[in-house]
């Protein structure tokens, strides 16, 4: 789809801005080289497909009625051999026609924070705003691993977004989190990369970091704040709901391998 068509894409995405938050953020001109948009129709409704190639594996996002989404996928010039999906449950049959997801699918929740909600500031020793220069410290933190460890961190996310962390006396991060992507112009931000070191859990660090991220986004004019939670991660969901996030919809993430034709 030509760049001139992004205005039409934006109009369609804004029919459900919470679900489409990542895609709305991807409309920034800086991401144009790694975004391929198609619009499909079932002769009644329209849907959007986005193939994003800015990460190690291409990602596919769909928004709109399933039949129209199927038409949008059919218009993608070259389907990736491997793809990471972010799709609503009704879109799963659409993508399953083209890729095999038998090895990796994860049921997820999309949560959103009401536009008029801010979180109380929680001062904690070692709390600091992180910059791109802290990328190595973030990677070191995430290397502690375990279930639900962030697996899509990239330093560019720090450059464009908001990251906060809590460090010990030696400067090592005990907990951190930030944004996957922010579109300051459209007021959209997606929170992610949240992680607390296993030996530092149970101290409320996740809530402190979350509040710092949310309030920084709010100060920058971001009204549409979303985040994703694996449906198996009840502890994380509990933290987010305690701070006012509410479930918007279930959806599915997963890795698919292109089916042979």
Residue ranges with predicted function:
Residues 86-92, 227-237, 254-260:
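Conserved beta-strand-loop-alpha-helix junction that forms the acyl-donor binding cleft
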Residues 53, 152-163, 167-195:
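A conserved beta-strand-loop-helix scaffold within acyl/acetyltransferase catalytic domains
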Residues 17-36, 143-169:
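Active-site rim helix/loop that mediates acceptor-substrate recognition in acyltransferases
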Residues 1-21, 107-110, 114-149:
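Short amphipathic alpha-helix that is part of the acyltransferase structural core
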Residues 52-123, 254:
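Acyl-donor-binding surface of acyltransferase catalytic domains
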Residues 11, 17-76, 177-188, 192:
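Conserved donor-binding loop and adjoining core beta-sheet/short helix segment
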Residues 95-96, 240, 245:
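Conserved active-site tyrosine of GNAT-family acetyltransferases
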Residues 66-77, 196, 202-219, 224, ...:
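Conserved acetyl-CoA-binding loop-helix of GNAT-fold acetyltransferases
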